[in-house]
Amino acid sequence: MATKRSSSAASKSSSARTKKSEVTQDQLMSWYKDMLLMRRFEEKAGQLYGMGLIAGFCHLYIGQEAVVVGVQGALEEGDQVITGYRDHAHMLATGMDPNGVMAELTGREGGYSKGKGGSMHMFSRDKQFFGGHGIVGAQVALGTGLAFSDKYKKNGKVCATYFGDGAANQGQVYESFNMAKLWDLPVVYIIENNQYAMGTSVARASSETHLHKRGASFGIPGEEVDGMDVTAVYDAAQRAVEHARSGKGPFILEMKTYRYRGHSMSDPAKYRTRDCLLYTSPSPRDR
């Protein structure tokens, strides 16, 4: 799986970014394989859900694969990852066994939570993956706490904390921003802006739709990134991770991406038309 720069407090777009990181052909091939695995895994999960072999909630990551693959490529061994309920691809990116993840989805004892956690609640201490959380936005405070632990231990590690555009409106997110900057914690906040919080578009839910600017009042730098371009994600993530690891505090990355499926398997996504599905290739583009 995907393995393993500083900025001012003013937000900026990816088009204004500094010199791009060199990416090798081997890296590109590895990223493509990772994204393809995630796509096929999610397609199979959707199929099994339809057959009644997966119970409860199931949120697919189809369309957003470039985000987690690009970010994971910028992390080092020992860096921590935490996310919300749309978490299958994040687990695969950290190197967790696809068989163990699928076993958990199907309620088997061989799953990462012994079949009791299901889709939204899996963890792996070995891979430094801390969930998988069903409460919207709860992982942001927890990720901030993980970063506090890293700073306290002086271990040089960073916590990649993922959340969505809907969770970006939760109050605890701003409490976390405040504490993270107050103590200059080594955390990178990754907002996966897939355009819809369940069935509500960003424009209908947020007065400030440029979500990377949300940390400006706290002095947290932010950047908007093309989340459909794995190389752009990797480039921005390297800068953000370097910023956090060097002791400069938190950084916000807004990944502009798109989910091809509904919010969950129970969502027919009737709130958008077929024309809204702009990206139709079998795997996210790595332009």
Language-model segment annotations:
Residues A167-G171, V230-D235:
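Active-site glycine- and acidic-residue-rich loops that bind
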Residues A89, Q195-M198, R259-R261:
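Short gly/pro/ser/thr-enriched loop/turn and capping motifs at secondary-structure boundaries
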Residues L185-Y189:
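A glycine-rich helix N-cap at a beta->alpha junction
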Residues Y279-D286:
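Conserved small/polar residues in nucleotide/adenosyl-binding loops
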